[in-house]
């Protein structure tokens, strides 16, 4: 009810017809999460090469897999193709390209007035996230523009308008930054996750679209089962790369 909504979120627009409260709804800092995961992996022996990208994947003798980069050739028992929006840019010998394309998303960070927002709010034209430093994140656009990661004035204005429609006090908020990213979208908006039928030892984990970070724990569990040859989760049937053929 409107009265209850105002009690939980006093700064919200007074003309709201109502709202659904989800007490467990949260958010995560992607950069911090990624750095934490990488640090933890290094402690267990992982090595990272961030200055070069994979170019080609092909089968190797004895069921192994070869990955070629611009300056190295690597062999492994298992290789996971998890290149997000760039997954189709890595050629897999004998296989079709992964049917994934980039969808640009733009997001604003506003320097909000104190107490502007208590919780994550979703509305018809966007969402707001109260950040620990007092700022508010405003998201986000969905744009089919290829690999263009520039931000646009039109998107900034539309997102600011969406923010003000949800929390009017944000009308005077200063724009701190604009972020852009590319989401990996598959033809059916469902992740591509499973073993390759063409290259033994190759595992696909891509096309998570707008929910890659949210799906991280599940993706890790499913891929781990495949890497270590454990019984696969039945959920993988709906995610199988074979549904597109040639993978």
What are these regions (language model features)?
Residues 1-44, 49-50, 56-60, 185:
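Flavin (FAD/FMN) cofactor-binding and adjacent substrate-gating region
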Residues 1-2, 50-52, 69, 177-179:
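Short loop/edge segments at beta-strand edges and connector loops
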Residues 30, 167-247:
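C-terminal catalytic lobe of FAD-dependent flavoproteins
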Residues 55-75, 79:
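Conserved beta-strand-loop-beta-strand element in the redox core of flavoprotein oxidoreductases
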Residues 64-65, 135-136, 203:
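Hydrophobic residues embedded in beta-strands of well-ordered beta-sheets
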Residues 73-74, 78-200:
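Active-site substrate-recognition segment that forms the wall
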